[in-house]
Regions:
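Extended, charge-rich alpha-helical interface modules
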Residues: 1-80
Length: 80
């Protein structure tokens, strides 16, 4: 993963609202393309959600991240 891409995404996500972060997550549902930029994007997105105290366990187990389903934010928890 390219740290420059990660840092750029991390800075962008830090400035976003939680609603915007959830919308960004949902925008990735069904996207099967993968490269180093996508890896940086996904990691920065999940890291920002976790940094804000959001429970992401419905989509991330610490190793595997799933964009199989749209999510909603409910009581600071991502819910499928």
């Amino acid at each position: 993963m390219n740290n420059s891409f990660y840092n750029d995404f991390a800075a962008r996500f830090a400035a976003c609202t939680l609603t915007s972060l959830v919308e960004t997550f949902n925008g990735q549902v069904g996207n099967r393309g993968f490269n180093s930029m996508r890896a940086a994007h996904d990691k920065a997105l999940i890291d920002e959600l976790v940094r804000r105290g959001v429970d992401v366990s419905a989509v991330f187990d610490g190793t595997t991240l799933s964009f199989a389903h749209h999510v909603v934010l409910d009581n600071n928890c991502l819910v499928i």
